[in-house]
């Protein structure tokens, strides 16, 4: 019999289960933090990257301005030192009563300037030199910048230069009427004054010209050098080294996504799939000419609408394609930009592909223009093409595309073409006993999302721990939560839906209570549908009365697409109907059941318009054919998402499994044996349906244990279970009228469905195992975050907190606040706390360690002493009277007992509060309902959403010990280790 591992993988959790010979041996949960900023969804590395970029940008600007100051000092015989600032003081050249540089830039066009004023004009323009390359800005910022540049360009038409425009439009008006102050420069998050760099360069050239005419003497070389230095731009790196290798030819690089050949390949794929679907559902056969007609339309215009497609294929306008949405069947926006920029040309396909490759990889405009000059292009074409923004690649190379597309032009599908060419994805032949790191595999270039990478890393950690403990297995079943692979905004939308769903359920619970209905999942769902359907039956249109809701036999929840045919148990596939309507519908879609009755069907169409779009489409679907049923069912049983297939293939290709037996059940509706599949990606819809059918309550997302329940269900979701489940649902749908006539009780119904449980007493066995789980969390040892807060403050701002100047000096000495470049800042994160114990009194003391300490490589040695607001006590030096116990990091596991508790409890360390010398800790599973009497003393302010204890004073703890928890939740006492310093 099979040894099976199962995993429920989320973006911050891993639920797992191990079964052997159908016996549930073990299960558990691993919780970890998402690799992103929880408030914004931005990368954790983004603040460091932005700070580093800002430092580099400022350093380059400083170097550029210093170079200009040297040039100006030499040419104008000025003192270079006068233009340098020391200790953040104003440079000597700028002291005194000076004219505004905006006014000087205007005067420079009309009168001779002094050497000092001309120097100020040059440096002012060079310091704020406008926008040049905004191709790589994010879309939101770029749009705002381009809009402002265009608006200012229109206004500049009335002025000689940018300086004159800014002076007259803003500075002079303010000078004349000081009540209406308007900033000349942009302030934070404002783009109103954005100017193209080319206009500022033209202004400086014009000023040089005018000053020469007015009699200012300077060399031509000086002018050229100033313009060169002032507007110098470092060449941007290309990204060719980051491009992954072809899936078929590993020595070839992947083809750019926005190349003509790639567009043709994508268009062919979509068109062939559409034509094949029409063949399978309508029995219509299309020729190669039809394929080419559609393709030529796409390649000519870059778009193909659904309306055009229907016309070209001879279909009626009201025909609806599978998954038809919006106006366009195919829309290649980048391809349209490409053909527009090219205009008329005589270039061949290879040249066009290479041009697209250059645009994708070369980000520096000057370098790109040089590269484009190699082709038969005029200057206008080069300029237009260099403005395009291309990124991303396919998984295959030009070499592979050139082999595959000719066969696809004959009408062959992508997989058929690959089979005919004997093209096989490069696979790993060296299988291992343990799964290697993701970045050591062929798939390393497939994922760059840090959230997904962390989830994969933790999955590997848990998997390898299980293999080490239990040995090799026959099969691994995986389910990926739907948020895995989604970006932050998409996940926020999912979370919003879940919260709304939770609220709707709670509201329905209250309504059940008011109506005297049993509070169970069935009645809650009935009430939700009752409200959504405006109190009407979805099929008959009859008004549903409160008395109908109170009568268990009057109403039923119907699957719009029959469950046995679709395996769709989602809310969007459910409606509330009178039992009689459900008896008539049986194992059919609404159209199959009621479509022949035109009057009734018209009524159903009207009723459906008041429902959500997804539900409306299901009800009105007239073409739910057998082939679609199989596709729909397969999608609902197996996870076909890209990220799920990636994790599946990563596991399958690199892990060595036990051989599978030949007598295992075959897959439903398939000739291939399921026994030959070592790794399967299960759908969340299947898990949800089995969870409900096997009697597990709805997920409580506030505690972590539901991940393990899902993993157990995934472990037992084998082919025989799925077949038995499908047969049961089919019988339930087909015999609905008969079952109702016999008045089969709810208890009989529950007993009837037990026959396909994995083993007798399955539910209770699982719940018993779940109760044994200790949730695992990785200790977060790595220092991360800013060294200090961004805001620099005056010393006086801290006087109240620390009791005047002396208190501030003491706070600086103790490291509570820091001095950076003469200014005071608040500390960054406290990433570690070192715990000491007094040798005589046995009291505990804590030495906080901040990211700044780590950066300075200075290990603090003073423990926090509690102080009142407005004063600061000396911290306590950890000398020979104290002994080091252990270091705590976020999510360290500790055993603690306060003086009021009867026994110690395991908790996870969350944070240390230095002002109160206390801990913040949390319960491992965050489950409120199972708090013991002893735990309630510790977690006195816990609630359903958060089981956290704050203000746990450390000095008088009866028990305070550190433990280690493995990836599988095994707890062992931490061995004593010497206090760890910082490597220099």
Regions found by a protein language model. Name each.
Residues 474-544, 567-569, 610-611, 617-619, ...:
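Short, charged surface segments at domain edges that flank catalytic/cofactor-binding sites
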Residues 2, 12, 530-534, 553, ...:
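Short metal-coordination and nucleic-acid-contact micro-motifs, chiefly zinc-binding Cys/His arrays
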Residues 71, 358, 407, 455-469, ...:
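Generic, well-ordered alpha-helical scaffold segments in large soluble proteins
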Residues 1-463, 706-720, 735-984:
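Extended, Lys/Arg-rich, non-catalytic nucleic-acid recognition/anchoring regions
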Residues 16, 541-577, 585-593:
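Histidine-centered nuclease catalytic patch
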Residues 2, 49-54, 436-449, 514-526, ...:
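Glycine- and acidic
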Residues 472-517, 638-793:
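Long, compositionally biased intrinsically disordered regions
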């Amino acid at each position: 019999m099979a040894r099976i591992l199962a995993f429920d993988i989320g973006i911050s959790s891993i639920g797992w289960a191990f079964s052997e010979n159908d016996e549930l041996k073990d299960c558990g949960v691993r919780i970890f933090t998402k690799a992103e900023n929880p408030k914004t969804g931005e990368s954790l590395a983004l603040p460091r990257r932005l700070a580093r970029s800002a430092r580099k940008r400022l350093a380059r600007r400083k170097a550029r301005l210093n170079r200009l100051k040297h040039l100006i000092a030499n040419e104008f015989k000025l003192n270079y030192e006068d233009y340098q600032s020391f200790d953040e003081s104003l440079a000597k050249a700028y002291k005194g009563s000076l004219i505004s540089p905006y006014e000087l830039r205007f005067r420079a066009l009309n009168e001779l300037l002094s050497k000092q004023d001309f120097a100020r004009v040059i440096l002012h323009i060079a310091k704020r030199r406008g926008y040049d390359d905004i191709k790589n800005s994010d879309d939101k910022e770029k749009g705002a910048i381009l809009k402002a540049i265009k608006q200012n360009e229109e206004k500049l038409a009335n002025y000689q230069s940018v300086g004159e425009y800014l002076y007259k439009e803003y500075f002079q008006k303010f000078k004349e009427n000081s009540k209406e102050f308007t900033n000349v420069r942009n302030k934070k998050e404002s783009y109103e004054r954005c100017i193209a760099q080319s206009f500022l360069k033209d202004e400086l050239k014009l000023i040089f010209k005018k000053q020469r005419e007015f009699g200012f003497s300077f060399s031509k070389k000086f002018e050229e050098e100033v313009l060169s230095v002032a507007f110098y731009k470092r060449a941007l790196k290309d990204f060719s080294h980051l491009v992954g290798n072809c899936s078929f030819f590993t020595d070839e690089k992947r083809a750019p996504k926005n190349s003509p050949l790639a567009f043709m390949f994508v268009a062919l794929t979509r068109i062939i799939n559409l034509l094949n679907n029409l063949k399978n559902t309508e029995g219509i056969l299309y020729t190669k000419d039809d394929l080419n007609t559609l393709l030529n339309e796409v390649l000519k215009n870059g778009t193909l609408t659904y309306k055009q497609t229907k016309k070209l294929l001879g279909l009626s306008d009201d025909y609806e394609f599978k998954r038809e949405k919006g106006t366009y069947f195919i829309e290649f926006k980048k391809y349209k930009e490409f053909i527009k920029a090219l205009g008329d040309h005589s270039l061949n396909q290879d040249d066009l592909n290479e041009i697209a490759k250059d645009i994708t990889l070369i980000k520096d405009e000057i370098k790109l223009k040089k590269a484009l000059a190699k082709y038969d292009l005029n200057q206008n074409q080069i300029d237009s093409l260099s403005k395009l923004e291309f990124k991303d690649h396919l998984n295959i190379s030009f070499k592979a595309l050139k082999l595959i597309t000719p066969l696809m032009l004959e009408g062959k599908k992508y997989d058929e073409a690959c089979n005919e060419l004997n093209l096989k994805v490069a696979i790993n032949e060296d299988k291992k006993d343990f799964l290697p790191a993701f970045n050591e595999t062929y798939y390393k270039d497939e994922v760059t999302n840090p959230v997904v990478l962390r989830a994969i890393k933790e999955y590997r950690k848990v998997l390898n721990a299980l293999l080490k403990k239990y040995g090799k297995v026959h099969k691994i079943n995986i389910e990926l939560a739907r948020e895995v692979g989604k970006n932050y905004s998409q996940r926020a939308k999912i979370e919003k839906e879940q919260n709304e769903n939770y609220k709707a359920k709670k509201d329905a619970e209250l309504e059940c209570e008011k109506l005297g209905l049993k509070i169970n999942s069935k009645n809650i769902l009935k009430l939700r549908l009752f409200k959504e359907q405006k109190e009407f039956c979805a099929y008959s249109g009859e008004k549903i009365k409160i008395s109908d809701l109170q009568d268990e036999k009057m109403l039923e929840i119907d699957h719009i697409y029959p469950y046995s045919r679709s395996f769709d148990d989602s809310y969007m596939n459910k409606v509330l109907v009178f039992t009689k309507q459900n008896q008539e519908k049986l194992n059919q879609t609404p159209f199959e059941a009621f479509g022949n009755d035109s009057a009734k069907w018209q009524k159903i169409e009207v009723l459906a318009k008041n429902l959500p779009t997804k539900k409306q489409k299901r009800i009105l679907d007239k073409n739910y054919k057998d082939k679609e049923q199989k596709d729909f069912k397969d999608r609902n049983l197996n996870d076909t998402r890209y990220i799920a297939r990636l994790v599946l293939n990563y596991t399958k290709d690199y892990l060595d499994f036990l051989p599978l037996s030949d007598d295992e059940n075959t897959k439903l509706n398939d000739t291939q044996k399921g026994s030959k599949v070592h790794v399967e990606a299960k759908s969340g819809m299947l898990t949800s349906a089995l969870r409900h059918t096997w009697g597990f309550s709805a997920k409580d997302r506030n505690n972590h244990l539901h991940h393990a329940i899902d993993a157990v269900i995934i472990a037992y979701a084998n082919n025989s279970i799925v077949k038995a489940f499908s047969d049961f649902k089919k019988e339930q749908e087909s015999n609905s009228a008969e079952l109702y006539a016999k008045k089969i009780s709810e208890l009989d119904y529950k007993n009837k469905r037990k026959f396909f449980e994995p083993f007798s007493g399955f539910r209770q066995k699982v719940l018993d195992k779940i109760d044994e789980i200790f949730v695992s969390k990785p200790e977060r040892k790595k220092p991360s975050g800013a060294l200090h807060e961004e805001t620099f403050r005056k010393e006086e701002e801290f006087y109240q907190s620390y009791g005047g100047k002396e208190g501030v000096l003491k706070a600086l000495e103790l490291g509570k606040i820091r001095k950076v470049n003469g200014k005071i800042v608040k500390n960054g994160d406290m990433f570690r706390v070192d715990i000491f114990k007094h040798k005589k009194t046995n009291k505990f003391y804590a030495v906080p360690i901040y990211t700044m300490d780590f950066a300075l490589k200075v290990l603090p040695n003073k423990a926090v002493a509690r102080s009142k607001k407005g004063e600061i006590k000396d911290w306590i030096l950890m000398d020979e009277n104290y002994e080091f116990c252990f270091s705590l990091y976020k999510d360290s596991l500790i055993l603690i007992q306060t003086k009021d508790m009867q026994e110690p409890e395991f908790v996870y360390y969350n944070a240390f509060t230095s002002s109160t010398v206390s801990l913040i800790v949390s319960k491992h599973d965050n489950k409120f309902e199972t708090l013991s009497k002893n735990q309630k003393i510790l977690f006195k302010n816990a609630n359903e959403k958060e089981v956290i204890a704050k203000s746990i004073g450390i000095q008088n703890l009866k028990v305070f010990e550190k433990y280690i928890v493995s990836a599988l939740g095994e707890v062992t006492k931490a061995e004593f280790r010497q206090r760890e310093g910082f490597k220099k």
